[in-house]
């Protein structure tokens, strides 16, 4: 529908003030236009001033979203100078002029060419002016007016999120806050109810509710259980116009998840479990697994297992597998089928975290009975002790019984057991054991001073099943017997001054004993009976395992007796008494007035001879000269014994090659020069062997010189014959070592032992006639026949 508005500008001549009048208007919207009078004054030839009415307007109103086929009429502009003759021209400028808004330049009618949207631009400011069409000059000042776009309800509410996600604990009270949703409306909130939004719930009842004005979603049902239903989808509607009929609406989806609380106790799926385990299971061995189910999740489903009652509280244990939430029953102590075959346990499963507000639901734990059957296993023998300690005197004879060990089969069969000694622990086979009763006895003599403790291992093995065996350590202590005599702790050699007084101490003696008596050592010292009478010295026993040598007279003469050998008898007080005689050497020496030794007879024991520096230098020079002389003499002798460069004629035709040299090429690449055979004059005279000199020397025989055309074969034969008849040629009477020739050779082996083929071909009886030196050899070779006979 087109809306018309006419603005009439009236001019009244002769009135002293302007008069406002209401313009004619047609407006379907019912909004009255405000009147505004703009007075423009003009000059006239008469002195009478006249006031003119110019534009009368303020603003236009225009509905948005116009859907008509024609342009939407906005209003009309009119000037009082417009006489209808087309002399004026109306011009429009400002927001949307010429595009959104056009004006009829003749009539001043304004129209909208496009559909307008208030949400895009609610106000347009334009300017209007009337000009003289002929001169182009404005006849009225330019004036500004406003076109306001009137809002209609053309926008539905839009939520800030398409999908909301929220959580709320299960078992919550009614009215528990869940989440708040928000929707906005682009319409003008200041005009009508187009932007007034009201919330309502379309889906999700009776579990949840929503506040109509705030959009807050709350729980509407008591004790919603996650285990029954965990996910909920709620659809919320936002409607404008205050929810009235004809209002626009929008919806959103809220996905609500119930979070878990610990409202379910653990429960065993069965009341009784049974497992089997062999009695040989070591501590820590898992026997079986039990599992209680808990409908909760996360930490609310964590379970702790414990043994609360039963016959095996101290024999078994239960641990919790944190990954699978299973209870693992393990062996805590060693089991014995012969003692107990069946155990009954009570295992409890409980939640470590319990919310007090759910205690009314009952105890958060459950129990089950576990029956464990112990299976019999063929066990090795068991010794009566973990270790044995025995004692024996070191003077015990061979086959002396020390003690015994005992082991038996723990199984019900009671298989017999045999005993043995682990020879890796008794390499010298000092001990042995009776395989039947386990008695330990000696097989060799013992010596405590050699080894005090003997640590061996005894093995007990089932006769019917040798694989079943066990070991036990056996510690044998050798008890001491007084079988060692005491002796001096060191070699004693002392001196006495010539001017010594009687009863003067010249040496303190100490003794040691390899034995270890229970009451400790107690030694006694005395002079040997043969030296006790007429001795120049006496022995004083200090009763503390030491003794002192005292002078018996005043003064000693080293020229009469320079050395005294003093035999001292050392005895112990153990049984049987052991004693030994040690000799103390006492030298008579010259001493100073302080008693310090200066010289003893013709030699000094401690002090140097007192040579002067010059004498020492002379001695050193003599030693150097002597060494130089020896070195020169040895060098001259070596020069004289240098080997000659010329080799013997026997070696002329020989190529000596060492074939045991690996690498470096072969040495026989330099073959014998055949030219030597053709030039015998170049051969030197025969020379004797350098390594062995014969006892009788013969003059070398000169061989005739062969002609140049002498046949090589004749020359070689001549040389061969010459060497065969030469007494100076080898072999000499010396030891020669030959390699094994083998049996394929015509000469067989050169070994005399291989010269006969069988033992029967050689008679060794003659070796017995060679005397006692060859008796061993005669026994070796003469006993062959007897061995065969046997």
UniProtKB/Swiss-Prot annotation:
Residues 54-159, 160-268, 269-383, 384-486, 487-608 form the Cadherin domain. Residues 637-790 are cytoplasmic. It is a single-pass type I membrane protein. CDD domains: Cadherin_repeat (cd11304). GO terms for biological process: adherens junction organization; calcium-dependent cell-cell adhesion via plasma membrane cell adhesion molecules; cell adhesion; cell migration; cell morphogenesis; cell-cell adhesion mediated by cadherin; cell-cell junction assembly; homophilic cell adhesion via plasma membrane adhesion molecules. Its main location: membrane. Residues 259-288 are annotated as: Disordered. Residues 269-279 have a biased composition (Polar residues). The chain crosses the membrane at residues 616-636. The keyword ATP-binding does not apply. This is Cadherin-6. The lineage of its organism: Eukaryota, Metazoa, Chordata, Craniata, Vertebrata.
């Amino acid at each position: 529908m087109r809306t018309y508005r006419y603005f009439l500008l009236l001019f009244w001549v002769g009135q002293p003030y302007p008069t406002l009048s209401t313009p004619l208007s047609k407006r379907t919207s019912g909004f009255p236009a405000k009147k505004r009078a703009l007075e423009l004054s003009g000059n006239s030839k008469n002195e009478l001033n006249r006031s003119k009415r110019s534009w009368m307007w303020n603003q236009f109103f225009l509905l948005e979203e116009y859907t008509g086929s024609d342009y939407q009429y906005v209003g009309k502009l009119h000037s009082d100078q417009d006489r209808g003759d087309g002399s004026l021209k109306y011009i429009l400028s400002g927001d949307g002029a010429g595009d959104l808004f056009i004006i009829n330049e003749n009539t001043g009618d304004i129209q909208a060419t496009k559909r307008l949207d208030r949400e895009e631009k609610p106000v347009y400011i334009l300017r209007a002016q009337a000009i003289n069409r002929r001169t182009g000059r404005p006849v009225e000042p330019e004036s500004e007016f406003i076109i306001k776009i009137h809002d209609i309800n053309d926008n539905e509410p839009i939520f800030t999120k398409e999908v909301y996600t929220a959580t709320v604990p299960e078992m919550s009270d009614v009215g528990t806050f869940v989440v708040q949703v928000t929707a906005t409306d682009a319409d003008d909130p200041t005009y009508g109810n187009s932007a007034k939004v009201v919330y309502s719930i379309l889906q999700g009842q009776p579990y949840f509710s929503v506040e109509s004005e705030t959009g807050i979603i709350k729980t509407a049902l008591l004790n919603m259980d996650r285990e029954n239903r965990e996910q909920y989808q709620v659809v919320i509607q936002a409607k404008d116009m205050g929810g009235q009929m004809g209002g626009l609406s929008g919806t959103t989806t809220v996905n609500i998840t119930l979070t878990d609380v610990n409202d379910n106790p653990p429960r065993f799926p069965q009341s009784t479990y049974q497992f089997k385990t062999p009695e040989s299971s070591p501590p820590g061995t898992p026997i079986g697994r039990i599992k209680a189910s808990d409908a909760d999740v996360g930490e609310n489903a964590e379970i702790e297992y414990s043994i609360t009652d039963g016959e095996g509280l101290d024999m078994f244990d239960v641990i919790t597998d944190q990954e699978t939430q299973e209870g693992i029953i393990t062996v805590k102590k060693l089991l014995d089928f012969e003692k107990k075959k069946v155990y009954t346990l009570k295992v409890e499963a409980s939640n470590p975290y319990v919310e007090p507000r759910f205690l009314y639901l009952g105890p958060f734990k459950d129990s089950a009975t576990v029956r464990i059957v112990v299976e019999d296993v063929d066990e090795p023998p068991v010794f009566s002790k973990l270790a044995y300690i025995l004692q024996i005197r070191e003077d015990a004879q061979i086959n002396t019984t020390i003690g015994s060990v005992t082991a038996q089969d723990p199984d019900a069969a009671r298989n017999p057991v045999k005993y043995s000694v682990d020879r890796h622990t008794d390499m010298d086979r000092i001990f042995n054991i009776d395989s039947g009763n386990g008695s330990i006895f000696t097989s060799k003599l013992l010596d405590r001073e050699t080894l005090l403790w003997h640590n061996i291992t005894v093995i007990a093995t089932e006769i019917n099943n040798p694989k079943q065996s066990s070991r036990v350590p056996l510690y044998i202590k050798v008890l001491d017997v007084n079988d060692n005599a005491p002796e001096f702790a060191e070699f004693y050699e002392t001196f006495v001054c010539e001017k010594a007084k009687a009863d003067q101490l010249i040496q303190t003696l100490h003794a040691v004993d390899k034995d270890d008596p229970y009451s400790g050592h107690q030694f006694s010292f005395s002079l040997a009976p043969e030296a006790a009478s007429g001795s120049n010295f006496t022995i004083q026993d200090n009763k503390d395992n030491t003794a002192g040598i005292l002078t018996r007279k005043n003064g000693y003469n080293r020229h009469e007796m320079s050395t005294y050998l003093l035999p001292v008898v050392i005895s112990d007080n153990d049984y049987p008494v052991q004693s030994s005689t040690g000799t103390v050497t006492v030298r008579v020496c010259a001493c100073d007035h302080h008693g310090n030794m200066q010289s003893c007879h013709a030699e000094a024991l401690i002090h140097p001879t007192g040579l002067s520096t010059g004498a020492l230098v002379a001695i050193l020079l003599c030693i150097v000269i002597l060494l130089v002389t020896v070195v020169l003499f040895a060098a001259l002798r070596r020069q004289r014994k240098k080997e000659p460069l010329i080799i013997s004629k026997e070696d002329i035709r020989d190529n000596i090659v060492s074939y045991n040299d690996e690498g470096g090429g072969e040495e026989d690449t330099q073959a014998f020069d055949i030219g030597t055979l053709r030039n015998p004059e170049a051969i030197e005279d025969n020379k004797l062997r350098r390594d062995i000199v014969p006892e009788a020397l013969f003059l070398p025989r000169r061989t005739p010189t062969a002609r140049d055309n002498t046949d090589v074969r004749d020359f070689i034969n001549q040389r061969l014959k010459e060497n065969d008849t030469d007494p100076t040629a080898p072999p000499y009477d010396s030891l020669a070592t030959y390699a094994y020739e083998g049996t394929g050779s015509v000469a067989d082996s050169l070994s005399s032992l291989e010269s006969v083929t069988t033992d029967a071909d050689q008679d060794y009886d003659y070796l017995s006639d060679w005397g006692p030196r060859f008796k061993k050899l005669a026994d070796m070779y003469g006993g062959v026949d007897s061995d065969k006979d046997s």
